[in-house]
Amino acid sequence: MGRNGEKQPIILMRKYHFLAAALLCISLQGYAQKPTKGGGISQEMLAQIERNGIQPNDRVISNALAMNKIDDLAMNFKNQHTLDTHFSVETPSQSIHDQKSSGRCWLFSGLNVLRANFARQHKDSIRVEYSQVYLSFYDQLEKANLMLQGVIDCADKPIDDQRVQFFFKNPISDGGTFCGAADLAEKYGVVPMEAMPEPYSAENTSRMAALISSKLREFGLELRKMVAAKKSTRDIQARKTEMLGTVYHMLTVSLGTPVKEFTYTFRDKYGKAVGKPRKFTPKSFYDETVGHPLNGTFVMVMNDPRRPYWKTYEVEYDRHTYDGHNWKYLNLPMEEIAQLAITSLKDSTKMYSSYDVGKQLDRKRGYLAMDNYDYGMLYDTTFPMDKADRISTFDSGSTHAMTLTAVDLDDNGQPVKWKVENSWGPSYGQAGCLIMTNDWFNNFMFRLVVDKKYCSDRVVKAAQQKPLMVMPEDPLFQEDK
């Protein structure tokens, strides 16, 4: 209707509608492309963003998510078939341990490899269970010394220097790598689980670690002041030793005093005693059950598609002991890593390996596959990043170490699926193990420790190159926990 109550011509009304729609379109384009001051969200931007809120078709999913877990709704039901648990190449099974609420997967996996090697040497007639807390104790003491000595070494730098901040931000943790397990076992020996069982604070480390970290930060500031005051090296080292005495006291109260001597009887896999009880020290037990130095016998390989393959890299300060070995690795394509693993498994040798285990993990079945969950369908989007992009953006990286124990090969000798011994207890997953498809293995497997005798001459030679140093802040160089 017109202003005076008269009907407007239909053609004029259509012209008005067309003009209004055109102006609205121009207006929307204008504020959609208009830059905001300082990159913030303006009211116009917010109005545009809010158009992506819940649509009528989303109501069912939104209501379901209000009362259910995301993974339960994103689960691919077609993937809930009965798992094929047959493996064409499999090493002998061994007992599954539980790291509980601690970040010691690297130590559990490392000791799993050592005890499997011992059983293999004795044709599975004798077995041993190593104490994890024994090496955990010295791991924490050594890391405390690494932090304090690192602070001394960098005391001439300002407090906001990147390396200084590295030490104060990460004074101590219970994560690590196989290199740390090797250094600690060689230096302090090993003991059986019966000689030093797990106390509460070994299985629940967060509070103990927080308190020791706080003390180390306090000590670090004191050492910086001593260096600034031109105190002698002798005085500084003497004070550092006193500080480590305090840390040692905190560790003994929490974890118990490390055993120095013990009596032990070896047993077979059925628990029957083999031989008479014998006295051991941690070092003599290492000689008896490991029998040789670990460093120099293995190659750590890694898949990092961001960097050139067949090059060796070393991570600065990524070690457990100040006088130990930095984490050094050879970067290889996944096809090469898979062949190294297959060769080892065919000779009944288990391996330390690490993964981004939280990705696409079916926790109920202990199954890892790329299509376990369809999050894209649930949220009407896609997640297209490849492995290199995920690493570069901190979306993925090595987070958890497990013991590679089996592979299933097709008729052409190509891997179809893999199995690992986990450290989340025997009731988790497949009797304490996880099964993963080869596609998932290629996407989320990162580190593998291989005995040199299973490596080609090319791999051994490449691993001996002078390594390129990389910083511990790199997205990929997280500790296995």
Where are these regions (language model features)?
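Structural recognition of the beta-strand scaffold that forms the well-ordered cores
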Residues: 107, 134-137, 183, 192-195, ...
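Active-site signature of cysteine proteases
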Residues: 34-36, 230-481
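Bacterial Sec-dependent N-terminal signal peptides
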Residues: 1-35
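N-terminal regions that are enriched for targeting/export leaders
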Residues: 35-95
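Post-signal peptide N-terminal segment of secreted/secretory-pathway proteins
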Residues: 81-154
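Papain-like cysteine protease catalytic cores
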Residues: 132-262
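Second-shell loop/turn segments in exported
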Residues: 91-103, 166-172, 323-331, 340-341, ...
